[in-house]
Regions:
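Low-acidity, Ser/Thr- and Arg-rich intrinsically disordered low-complexity segments
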Residues: 3-13, 19, 23-26, 31-32
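Pocket-forming structural segment of enzyme catalytic cores
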Residues: 165-232
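N-terminal beta1-alpha1 cap of cysteine-dependent amidohydrolase-like domains
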Residues: 21, 52, 56-149
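Ala/Thr-enriched low-complexity intrinsically disordered regions
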Residues: 12, 28-29, 48, 52-60
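Catalytic nucleophile loop
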Residues: 144-168
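Targeting/processing segments of secretory and organellar proteins
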Residues: 35-38, 44-52
């Protein structure tokens, strides 16, 4: 889902046939590999290419920054693990940040992000006074959903996204800690790679409702909303 840029090609112009030649011919396509092959010793970072055509004169190739997935990590022991491995496997670059204590965090340009991952943590999703960075994370979550940018929330991240979209947060009837089953309830088989019921690790006190427009994906005996999706 986050691999929308991994095979990016842009209609542009063809680099000339000789090594180091920057002349362009319109009506063809330039790929990252093509430019590496044709640019001699030049070093190119990223693979989204913008070619500026200058008539019959020489043209300029501008290399745009490689889109990154922003991973928001709140505590050292809640790491992205296999999420990070899978992102790397499909060729996406990532940047991991902890902004939980920062009122005005210096975040990457939103338009240049390929996606957002919000990890877990022991704080509450609405603990803005103690952890001011959570408010920035909620704002980022709303922007991602509104723009259709891929976003994934795990545990606390799931709660941050839900509350950012208007869902209610409350204490559960009892802490849910340890391995226990959840039931897949999605009607569109979004988690079709899993059994209808599977055992996962739980560690939370708070629970959230389903935000407006959300589709319920999984629940457990004590938590009605274990997973949901929203948007595209």
């Amino acid at each position: 889902m986050l691999n929308r840029y991994s095979k990016s090609l842009m209609n542009a112009s063809q680099v000339g046939p000789e090594r180091g030649d920057r002349r362009m011919r319109s009506g063809t396509t330039v790929s990252r590999e093509h430019v590496f092959d044709r640019c001699g010793n030049c070093e190119i970072h990223g693979f989204a290419l913008l070619v500026t055509q200058t008539g019959n004169a020489r043209a300029t190739i501008e290399v745009m920054a490689t889109p990154q997935v922003l991973i928001l990590q709140h505590v050292p022991w809640e790491r992205p693990g296999r999420i990070l491995s899978n992102l790397e496997d499909i060729g996406l670059e990532t940047v991991t940040m902890n902004i939980v204590d920062k009122k005005k965090p210096d975040l990457p340009d939103f338009g240049e992000l390929a996606g957002v991952v919000i990890m877990g943590g022991p704080m509450g999703a609405l603990d803005y006074d103690k952890y001011p960075g959570l408010k920035a994370e909620a704002k980022l979550a709303r922007a991602a959903v509104a723009s259709g940018k891929p976003i994934l929330g795990v545990c606390l991240g799931h709660q941050i996204i839900a509350t950012a979209l208007g869902a209610q947060l409350r204490k559960g009837d009892a802490p849910e800690i340890g391995f226990a089953p959840i039931k897949r309830v999605d009607k569109h088989d979004f988690f079709s790679m899993w059994d209808k019921q599977l055992t996962v690790l739980h560690w939370h006190n708070d629970v959230v409702g389903l935000p407006e427009g959300g589709q319920l994906l999984a629940r457990s005996s004590s938590t009605k909303v274990q997973a949901f999706r929203i948007g595209s």
